[in-house]
Structures are given as C-alpha cells and as structure tokens.
Amino acid sequence: MRRLVYCKVVLATSLMWVLVDVFLLLYFSECNKCDDKKERSLLPALRAVISRNQEGPGEMGKAVLIPKDDQEKMKELFKINQFNLMASDLIALNRSLPDVRLEGCKTKVYPDELPNTSVVIVFHNEAWSTLLRTVYSVINRSPHYLLSEVILVDDASERDFLKLTLENYVKTLEVPVKIIRMEERSGLIRARLRGAAASKGQVITFLDAHCECTLGWLEPLLARIKEDRKTVVCPIIDVISDDTFEYMAGSDMTYGGFNWKLNFRWYPVPQREMDRRKGDRTLPVRTPTMAGGLFSIDRNYFEEIGTYDAGMDIWGGENLEMSFRIWQCGGSLEIVTCSHVGHVFRKATPYTFPGGTGHVINKNNRRLAEVWMDEFKDFFYIISPGVVKVDYGDVSVRKTLRENLKCKPFSWYLENIYPDSQIPRRYYSLGEIRNVETNQCLDNMGRKENEKVGIFNCHGMGGNQVFSYTADKEIRTDDLCLDVSRLSGPVIMLKCHHMRGNQLWEYDAERLTLRHANSNQCLDEPSEEDKMVPTMQDCSGSRSQQWLLRNMTLGT
C-alpha cells in the first residue's frame, strides 16, 4: 500500500515538472530576444501556471461561502471594513485568479524597453489580508524589471498589526516595499501626493488597498504610456464581491462619465468609439472620465499636468477634476482593455470624514467646477445648490495652472470628448416644474429607470426636483426623460433616446400646459388613487394642467 502511494507521488511530481518543461520550451521558443537581466513575463506566467493546481478557499477567484454556524460572527467582522473579513482571511494571500482577458489580448507582444513603475497604495485601517493580497498580486504578476518599488502610504492607521508587524513582514518580500507614515489623517489625495513625491519609477501606478492584479495587467499599461507619455491609462476594473470575494470580470464595453450631480458613472461605450477602434475591442477605449482608484501616469507628466489639487480634502471629485484637466490641457485618458485589476466594491464606507461626507464632497466639487467648468458650473449649482454655500478655499493657483497650460474650455470637452454627456447644451428651462393648482413640484423621488415620475411638496433644494426642458423638447432629469407610451399614461422615466416620439413634450408658455405630442394629452395633477404621481388627461386648460417652469426662456 505504501509502495502504491509512493508511486503516485512520484508520478504526480513528474507530471508537474513535465508541464513546467513544456511551458519553458514554448516560452523560450517565442522569446529569442530575452536576456537574463530582464525576465519579461516569465516568472509571472510561470507562477500563474503553477497556481492553477492550487486548491483552497477562493482559488481561481471562486466565491467563499461561510457556514451557517459562523454567520453571526461573519456579520460582526463585516462591520470592521464593510466587507466579509472572515471570507477574506480564509483566502490565501497569493490566491490564483482566472485569466479574464479577451483572447486577442493573450497573444499581444509588448516592446522589450518599457518604462518601469512605482506602485503607490494608500491605506487606512485596511484589513491585513486585503492589503497583503494587493501587494502579493502586484509582485507575483508583474515582471520585476518593470517594478521599481511598491510604496505603501499609511494614512494614520490605528491598528497595531499595520505598524511594526507590517514593517517587518514587507522586508521579506521579493521587491522593495517602502512604508510612508502620514503624521495625521490626511485623506487619499494628500496621501497619494506624498507617495508620488517619494517615488522613483518612470511611471506612477496608483492602486487602492483592496485590489488584485491579474496576469498580464502591467505591460499593456506601460506600453501605452511608452507610445504617448501624455496618455493616462486605467485597467478594466473587475469586481471582487464584498460578500464572497468572488472575482468577476468587468466589461470592456463600458466607460466613465458623470451625471448632473458630478457623480462618476459607468455608461455603455458609444458606437462612435467602437467605430474609431474599427471594432477591435483589444484597443484602448478613450474615456471621458476615470473612476480614479486605479491608473498609471508618466511621473514627469503627473508633475507637468498639476498632480492633484492639494486644496481638495480626503477623497471625492478628484477623479473628475483630473479627468477634465487631462483632456482640456492636451492629454488623453484611456481604459486599456487588455489590463484587468480586481477591486473590492463596498456598499458603504467604513470611514468617517471630518465635517461629514457631504461637506467634503461639496467642497471638492465646488473647486473643480470653479476652475474647469466655465459657464456650465451654473448648471451644476442649480442641481446642487448646497454646493454654493460651502467655503471652497483659494483656487487662484489652480486657475493659473490652467492658464499656463493653455487649456481648452469645458464646452470643447463636452463637444469633442463627451458629446454623450447628460448635460444638455441647449435648454429652455432648468429647475423645478411646479403645478399651479397644487403648488407641488415634479420629483424623480430618487427612482430609477422604468419607474414613475413623482410629485411632492416643493423644497427649493434642487436635487430630485430639478428638471430640464431641453431644446429637443424633452423633459429630462439627469439621463432619464419623461416618457408616455399609451393613452392616459402612466408617465415613466426612461433613458433619453433623442428620437422624440414618446418623449416629445410641447410647452405652451401662455396656457402653461405641457402637452404630450404623441397622445395629445396634457400633464395633470395626481388622481385620488395615487396622490404621489402626476397623471395624463385630455387637455382642458384647467389650473391642474398648468405648470410653471423655472427660468423659462422658450423661444431663445
């Protein structure tokens, strides 16, 4: 029996080394130019081959399911970082991941002489397992000759294991890992600036502290910067479940935009961008904005373009500020579809903001609007009137930067880079739509696409009660338009399609009526059955069918 077990072990070991030999033979047959000094992608690829034989929780990106007996403990641990800490701690720090790249990406060959990079990771009270899994994924899946260093910036963490224990641990890793300590809680923006200032690489790559890099993630980013140093590049951001840590591939068919409130949003890649790439999905996507957590930028260009706005606090808005600045000042922003990095997306943040989240984000957004949005800032202020009340500090240095860089106006950005923007360039009215009879206002109620528009007491605080009556005669709330598909309604909010039809409304500035062209009915007050939604009725000229549109300029 023992002899049989021994034979099986020998056979299994032999098979594994045969596979390694075959891999090496195939690799070097394609790599005549490789030298010993530059390992190219050999070690990361070899690690990936070996990792496919690993078994254990979360391997190959599979979900980790916690037994029922441990559910209560799991829920308590979840509160610490707002993700399933129990699941994360069960997963190996160097777990294997699936290769989620497009097939065309797997055969791409990149230049030998690529710039190297410093990877800057900011953390604050991060979990040990997610932080170290981020670091390991960078080291194990990056050619070391391209990896100048990993810089961990501790934004005043309070947990003991992130002090001396972490310092001693990173000394054992294969590449230089430097830890920088912020003296006080400074936020992502200032911590990244500190890390960038200490970096030595030709390129700076910023990552969040709960990421996992996949095979071949780095070379496509650096190759694109080598082609054009003024191109700022982002990987496709894959989703790591905050509940199970399952690894799910992100889409190469989405890119970054923003809504009326200047919140970053993902939108489908438009047909014009597909046409520009001639249908080749392995080519980079030009994106109007970036999510901001994960990107690479030439270190000198980072300085030339103005780094981050140091007047912004913590985080929020800095990604749009940098996106506008890059495009308006002669650079470009791309999603490199052959690069994949996973990110733990949390439903809530475990951190508190000095002054509150709303105050911080309002200040940051006010700064970016004042410097970069020109006359379109007034549109944003109507949507978010609370922003105007915030002390946003001195932006004269940033305005001087814009002048020195000879940056283009925001209208150029909307017309040339983001023509699909939800901001209407021409509109007759922007603000509340108030019913004369009830003195109530249309309200989107925070509802989503394919739900009914509501009506509520007017509050004068913008937000959900801001509608635009556009030059195309749509009634818009952000990227949704009021749509009526049948007689007597209901009035539904659907994606604006710009094809008129069910979304065409005629406003009579004398009678104050909003007539739906297709049904020939008028928007009316709510019925007794549901006092929270407007109705569609035959036009009668009654006060209940009269609506006051704020700042109405019909005919301009």
UniProtKB/Swiss-Prot annotation:
Domain of life: Eukaryota
Keyword tags: Disulfide bond, Glycoprotein, Glycosyltransferase, Golgi apparatus, Lectin, Manganese, Membrane, Metal-binding, Signal-anchor, Transferase, Transmembrane, Transmembrane helix
Catalytic class of the enzyme: transferase
Pathway where it operates: Protein modification; protein glycosylation
Domain observations: There are two conserved domains in the glycosyltransferase region: the N-terminal domain (domain A, also called GT1 motif), which is probably involved in manganese coordination and substrate binding and the C-terminal domain (domain B, also called Gal/GalNAc-T motif), which is probably involved in catalytic reaction and UDP-Gal binding. The ricin B-type lectin domain binds to GalNAc and contributes to the glycopeptide specificity.
Tagged with keyword Transmembrane: yes
Entry's Gene Ontology cellular component terms: Golgi apparatus; Golgi membrane
Gene3D superfamilies xrefs: 2.80.10.50, Spore Coat Polysaccharide Biosynthesis Protein SpsA, Chain A
Cystine pairs: C105-C338, C329-C407, C441-C458, C481-C496, C522-C539
Protein name per Swiss-Prot or TrEMBL: Polypeptide N-acetylgalactosaminyltransferase 13
Family designation: Belongs to the glycosyltransferase 2 family. GalNAc-T subfamily.
Documented EC number(s): 2.4.1.41
Topology, Lumenal side: 28-556
Organism: Rattus norvegicus (Rat)
Cofactors (names): Mn(2+)
Subcellular location per the Swiss-Prot or TrEMBL entry: Golgi apparatus membrane
A GO term for molecular function: carbohydrate binding
